[in-house]
Amino acid sequence: MVAAKTIKSLVDKADLPDNIKEELYNKLIEYNKKYKFKKAEVEAIIEETVKEYQNSLVEPGEAIGTVAAQSIGEPSTQMTLNTFHYAGVAEINVTLGLPRIIEIVDARKNPSTPIMTVYLDEKHRYDREKALEVARRIEGTTLENLAREMSIDILNFEFIVEIDPERLEKSGLDMEKIQKKLESSFKSAEFEVDGYTLIMRPKKVTKLSDLRRLSEKVKKHRLKGLSGVGKTIIRKEGDEYVIYTEGSNFKQILKVPGVDPTRTRTNNIHEIAEVLGIEAARNAIIEEIVNTMRDQGLEVDVRHIMLVADMMTLDGVILPIGRHGIVGEKASVLARAAFEITTQHLFEAAERGETDPLNGVVENVLIGQPVPVGTGIVKLAMNLPLRPKRE
């Protein structure tokens, strides 16, 4: 049996990335206990691993962009084009399939169905009542959400709201709190509470249109919860309770007492970049695309997706793949013109006196030169031997 120290020194000498070295070392230690390897066997395993690793590297000149585009694009043709309910939660809609992939690669500022998955800390995650406490802190509640009926009394110039007692109790608010919050936010009106009825009277408004406008603002006013977050759903996953939110406010959710900030996540990639940085956003892009494809029963090698995520986050900000992002920033005039809005690109380039270095694939195809891909990247010059002198 080989000593762990010897295995460590042999693995360290191998020409492999650190993460593979670590995994290889752990596996060798595990199997060494079981099979009691000789030193020569350990060396043979390491040698075979290095050989396999080198065989798996991309060949110089491989058109990895084209391969990635094919590998992601082909399975995408089999994806759904609809927005579906979240798995097991009928109340929350989430964009799946091709629309979600397009949303990610277009780097849209606001996803069409923003969602946060909120994990709870040790104290709150195993008890539904405690999870409900946290959900109440998060859930955005407006007067409209609590109302059973709303009406405008034209004769008395009043806005009357009948509150649903059940919804009120569920929200953790009471009539007095609602009155105080509205009074502090709307100085131009008086608020009166009568049982479960709230009456608003404007102080100065004389037109019916002004009363309608004010009543719209009052009913949409946020009474509690995080801005940007609508309803919340609590689901049991394994032993713990997890909260799903409709809407996203990643910066604020991490500060809410009872939330586990190390595991909580959002599907808004721009929020992740802003709060956790560009590396976290890159990981989120990879994970979102992989999960979206996996939900449709499609498997794509993660390295193709990693390449897309790397290109999108290379400059430290999230760039879309398109004329407003990566393609629009290409150094080649002809490549930009070949993609979209051809004449505009050519006119602007002529105006600035730009030159094209002809380093890429598209521009060389356009002018009929060999493409710098595969054998096209190799430049050979033959050194002919001198003819021997005649005797």
Swiss-Prot record:
Family annotation (CDD domains): RNAP_A
Primary localization: cytoplasm
Domain of life the protein comes from: Archaea
SUPFAM superfamilies the record matches: beta and beta-prime subunits of DNA dependent RNA-polymerase
Role played: DNA-dependent RNA polymerase (RNAP) catalyzes the transcription of DNA into RNA using the four ribonucleoside triphosphates as substrates. Forms part of the jaw domain.
Source organism per UniProt: Thermococcus onnurineus (strain NA1)
Reactions this protein catalyses: RNA(n) + a ribonucleoside 5'-triphosphate = RNA(n+1) + diphosphate
Name of this protein: DNA-directed RNA polymerase subunit Rpo1C
